[in-house]
């Protein structure tokens, strides 16, 4: 009768134990079901953001104010607001803002994410005419004002969002220079244009050329209003000609595009499940790339923009000591919006749930098999 040797002896010639082979099998299976995110924490995004010292206090105040105004009453609704932690997002790109200015920015952050939801998943996502009307009302608030009794038949939460924005705008108007007010107004109009544009072209957006597509996407990402807020809380007094300089426009565009690309990498799983189309990774996979190839290609787009950033900074104009100090604060603020957004995306459970810290460490995420 044949004698069966102990299992460990079977692998003696290869000097591998059962546990070692099991580890190899497990490792192979892992490689087949996971892929690696790009290393997004590079260049200026490698530094950890500072936190506004008023973060905890103002978060509690702002969340309570918005929850009451927007009638968030269920445990699920309140938990969503608290866990999203939009105040932390703000705290990481406004570390030097005073309490009053930081409160205004936190209120805007709470407002903007719920306002954006109307266009992404809410009652405006399939109705371009109603989406445009909502954008027009926002412009009305910043130009001729909005009375409490206007549009009484609209949805209560839509009206609540308008009044929240009106409150923010009134606080900005009381403190900011005419130039900051104008740039904020223009930034918000561009933001709304991007939101409405996404509603209108969901089915037929031309994604063949990525650079024009990213130019389209940067409108709706909301980065430029954040940059204008830096002028607001730093009380910058830069001349209008500064904002017309090509390098300044390039820096602002790049800050927005880097943020878009970061978000698209991190939100891919969530947006794929939702059936979203406005995501670079989704677009690249539709072109035949694997998930890893799409991540790698997106990483190249990010690195290209980081290199362009440094070139643009080197072309900034000089104005003398006093104004050049303000220029440096402005440039740093543009960086901090992208840095803060990236770190916040991993600090909360927005994209990866309770696996956020592990994925931040390993960069390994689940491989998605495309649906037929």
Curated annotation (Swiss-Prot):
GO molecular function annotations of the record: metal ion binding; terpene synthase activity
Highest rank taxon of the organism: Eukaryota
Disruption phenotype: Abolishes the production of penifulvin A.
GO annotation terms (biological process): isoprenoid biosynthetic process
Catalytic activity: (2E,6E)-farnesyl diphosphate = silphinene + diphosphate
InterPro entries noted in UniProt: Isoprenoid_synthase_dom_sf, Terpene_cyclase-like_2
Entry keyword set: Lyase, Magnesium, Metal-binding
Record: residues binding Mg(2+) 3: 263, 267, 271
EC number: 4.2.3.-
Binding positions (Mg(2+) 1): 116, 121
Motif DDXXE motif: positions: 116-121
Cofactor note: Binds 3 Mg(2+) ions per subunit.
Named cofactor requirement(s): Mg(2+)
Pfam family, one: Terpene_syn_C_2
Pathway annotation from the record: Secondary metabolite biosynthesis; terpenoid biosynthesis
Enzyme class, first EC level, given as a word: lyase
Binding site for Mg(2+) 2: 121
Function noted in UniProt: Sesquiterpene cyclase; part of the gene cluster that mediates the biosynthesis of penifulvin A, a potent insecticidal sesquiterpene that features a [5.5.5.6]dioxafenestrane ring. Within the pathway, peniA catalyzes the first step and generates the angular triquinane scaffold silphinene via cyclization of the linear farnesyl pyrophosphate (FPP). The cytochrome P450 monooxygenase peniB and the flavin-dependent monooxygenase peniC then catalyze a series of oxidation reactions to transform silphinene into penifulvin A.
Entry's family note: Belongs to the terpene synthase family.
UniProt free text on domains: The Asp-Asp-Xaa-Xaa-Glu (DDXXE) motif is important for the catalytic activity, presumably through binding to Mg(2+).
Listed name of the protein: Silphinene synthase peniA
Organism encoding this protein: Penicillium patulum
